[in-house]
Swiss-Prot record:
Annotated PROSITE patterns: SIGMA70_1 (PS00715), SIGMA70_2 (PS00716)
GO cellular component, one term: cytoplasm
Name by which UniProt lists this protein: RNA polymerase sigma factor RpoD
Motif window: Interaction with polymerase core subunit RpoC: 401-404
GO biological process, one term: DNA-templated transcription initiation
DNA-binding region, residue range(s): 571-590
Keyword terms: Cytoplasm, DNA-binding, Sigma factor, Transcription, Transcription regulation
Species the sequence originates in: Treponema pallidum (strain Nichols)
CDD domains, sorted: Sigma70_r4 (cd06171)
Subunit structure: Interacts transiently with the RNA polymerase catalytic core.
Residues passing through the membrane, by range: none
Pfam family name, one: Sigma70_r2
Chain intervals for the UniProt region annotation (Sigma-70 factor domain-2): 377-447
Length: 611
């Protein structure tokens, strides 16, 4: 017991309980679970220690009882559940004592009942610990999300990345880029092409009008920028060169007025963060290599470059650095490569390395602010998803699948919620959650997918059938349902046929259930043996009859009708083979067919024609 009391989890638990003079079951479980302690193993000993400390352990049921009892004592005379007056102080004490006696047993049973491998129970327990939000808190979180998104958007619109990225968007919308979407040339799947086409339509609708007027100037600016890059000019020249700076400011002022969509904000911000990671990696690599060569500045770098070119200085470098010339050359080359990559990044972002890192840090702060507020709003409303999902059980999907689909709808609701309209978030989110759940039932509940509009028609027929069953006391006919819905009888029958559920091939058949339904279903992939035999006999008979014809007529018929498994050749193709005209081949074919129509030959094939 002494060793147990010295463990961090139990020490924290006792400290917390001594301050409050009481503790609840949930608090005991949460504190132990926070320190990674198996609750069920230590629960007996922990409860004994709490009893020795004269600390009361209350269950959640007891807290509810206490609230109810004292509400009855303080309020007006009310029914006590059996028509009596409010509880007296003695009855209150008796009930609380009875509850205390059961507290220990309740806690032990709860710990055993929640299995560690039951994800549904664990999930429901976790989301139950989240506190609900007030309308003011929802507005505050929405404002924080808006603020985080605003930080990211401001950084992107003020950065030099905006102009090159919009130039690439404009180029992707040009006619040359459209040719790449040809499946024959691209070698991509239909899905990939359709997704790219959808994204292209979105970009064209959002930015097409602006880019149509700015693209020629953007192309001219990018050409000037490329010339400066090829000359080896530093990135600061973009702000110092008068012509480039004038063109750049003009284009940026136009692009900053464009309303960026969420897809572009997300893509640009991810590019900033990914590039910042690359920059930090390049700088670490460069610092490591410079330490190996004892380079402090650019002057030392040039000295090593000159030293490697002169044999006498090369030997001195080897002696100073303690490595071979080849190794020095390799490290020197690596430094040059990293320097070129960093310079390339500066030109792509039209900013210095320090400026890019500073912007990336600001974007990261905006992302953290946005994510924290978004997660808080989502977690506080997970119980709403569960309550809505309960209404859609037994419709083809498991309860937990419905909850997860509803969670997807909740995430979309958080992203699209407009707090300025004055509605409470739960009112708005309910519609998104319902839509996500009903759509998932329509798409996934059936083995064979049925379109959503057909699902709606099936629901109408089912609803009317149920109402007519209650009205007539019997199953309604198709005509009665059609009359009620103002449909045709054929449409009702069609909807009913679509509504039929698939049946398993393993369904047992017969009284003894010694066979399954699959045993009686013909295999469409296997050809009927009698038909195969019949075709072989027909082939042999035709070959025998054709052998009685002259060789030329036999060959013409074989080529014209593709009797050897080849395709049927045209008169012109057969004529080229025999080096005669099309008309001559037609005459030979007609003569051969006339011979075959003789009863002596046709009688042999008549049986095959009847079958």
């Amino acid at each position: 017991m002494m060793e147990l009391s010295r463990t961090p989890a139990v020490m924290r638990l006792l400290e917390y309980a001594r301050e409050k003079k009481a503790i609840t079951h949930d608090e005991v479980e949460n504190i132990l679970a926070h320190y990674g302690v198996e609750t069920e193993e230590l629960l007996h000993d922990v409860l004994d220690m709490l009893e020795q400390e004269n600390i009361k352990v209350f269950s959640s049921e007891e807290e509810e009882l206490e609230d109810e009892v004292f509400a009855g004592l303080k309020g007006p005379a009310a029914d006590d559940g059996d028509g009596s007056f409010p509880l007296s102080t003695e009855r209150v004490r008796d009930k609380l004592c009875d509850s205390s006696r059961g507290a220990r047993q309740n806690l032990l049973s709860n710990a055993r009942n929640i299995a560690l491998d039951d994800p549904v129970k664990l999930y429901l327990r976790d989301i139950g610990q989240e506190k609900l939000l007030t309308a003011e808190q929802e507005v505050m979180l929405s404002k924080r999300m808006e603020e985080g998104e605003g930080i990211i958007k401001d950084i992107i619109t003020q950065s030099g990345l905006l102009l090159p990225e919009f130039y690439h968007i404009g180029r992707s919308l040009s006619k040359k880029a459209l040719a790449v979407l040809d499946p024959a040339e691209s070698g991509r799947t239909r899905k990939e092409i359709s997704e790219e086409m959808a994204d292209r339509r979105r970009l064209k609708q959002a930015y097409g009008e602006v880019l149509r007027s700015l693209y020629p100037e953007m192309r001219h600016y990018m050409a000037m920028k490329k010339r400066l890059d090829e000359r080896g000019e530093p990135v600061t020249v973009l702000s110092s060169d008068e012509e480039v700076c004038k063109q750049r400011d003009k284009l940026l002022s136009c692009l900053q007025k464009v309303d960026l969509q969420l897809e572009e904000i997300d893509r640009f911000s991810r590019k900033f963060l990914d590039t910042a990671r690359k920059i930090r990696e390049y700088k670490r690599r460069k610092d490591r290599h410079e330490k190996q060569l004892m380079i402090a500045d650019l002057c030392d770098m040039r000295k090593i470059g000159r030293g490697l070119a002169v044999p006498r200085q090369r030997a001195k470098l080897e002696e100073t650095l303690g490595m071979s010339a080849d190794c020095i050359q390799e490290i020197y080359t690596q430094i040059q490569k990293v320097t070129r990559r960093l310079r390339r990044i500066e030109y792509d972002f039209e900013n210095t390395i320090d400026g890019i890192l500073s912007m990336a840090r600001a974007i990261h702060r905006g992302h953290v602010m946005l994510k924290k507020a978004k997660d808080k709003l989502i977690n506080a409303n997970l119980r709403l998803v569960v309550s809505i999902a309960k209404k859609y059980t037994n419709r083809g999907l498991l309860f937990f699948d419905l909850v997860q689909e509803g969670n997807i709808g909740l995430i979309k609701a958080v992203e699209k919620f407009e707090y300025r309209k004055g509605y409470k978030f739960s009112t708005y989110a309910t519609w998104w959650i319902r839509q996500a759940i009903t759509r998932s039932i329509s798409d996934q509940a059936r083995t064979i997918r049925v379109p959503v509009h057909m699902i709606e028609q099936i629901n109408k027929v089912t609803r009317e059938s149920r109402q007519l069953l209650q009205k007539f006391g019997r199953e309604p006919s198709d005509e009665e349902i059609a009359q009620q819905l103002c449909w045709t009888v054929e449409k009702v029958k069609q909807v009913k046929s679509v509504a039929r559920e698939p049946i398993s091939l393993e369904t047992p058949i017969g009284e003894e259930e010694d066979s399954s339904l699959g045993d009686f279903v013909p295999d469409a992939d296997v050809e009927n043996p009698s038909r195969v035999t019949e075709r072989v006999l027909l082939k042999e008979e035709v070959r025998s009859i054709l052998s009685a014809l002259p060789a030329r007529e036999h060959e013409v018929l074989r080529m014209r009708f593709g009797l050897d498994g080849d395709y049927s050749q045209t008169l012109e193709e057969v004529g080229l083979y025999f080096d005669v005209t099309r008309e001559r081949i037609r005459q030979i074919e007609a003569k051969a067919l006339k011979r075959l129509r003789h009863p002596r030959h046709s009688r042999r094939l008549k049986d095959f024609l009847d079958s």
